[in-house]
Amino acid sequence: NTMNSIASLIDSRPEQAEQVVEDLSELFRASLVESSRQTTVADELHLCRLYLRIEQLRLGERLQVDWQLDEDLLDSAMPSLILQPLVENAVYHGIAQIPEGGRVCIRLSCAGNSIVVGVENPVPASPAAVTNGHHMALDNIRQRLRALYDDEAALIVTPGADVHAVELRMPRERLA
């Protein structure tokens, strides 16, 4: 889909096509990094923004994003590519399946000594539009959290009739 979007932009909007190629390249580079590597919350949010900018080309105004971020947490440590798959799931299983689109809400807050990240998206009204998937991204995130934090971190999925919510909790640490 992304490559088709780029191809369609090359003649009409070459600067935008170039930007999408750069965004996609940065996402590819990030995906090649060792999965146990720590980065900052700010860097993870940057990858989410790159991904959402690419999806915005495909979905246009159907994709709305609401960022609710505690700026004091931006320099906290976070495993590389732990948040972007949650945002991707929200777009793929939620927004893209709804003809009129919807809003992805991304929240970042602190609860005691924990970072709490929430990602919410609307649920398609038609049962035929719901794509359950294989939960590979969620299983991968749970395994990584367990390996890095043992029982101090959690991924909580709350499917609802109207809203699908995912909450990621992990210890707040500074990047060493």
Walk through the language-model features, giving the residues of each:
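Two-component histidine phosphotransfer core
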Residues: 1-158, 163-169
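C-terminal end segment of the histidine kinase catalytic
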Residues: 171-176
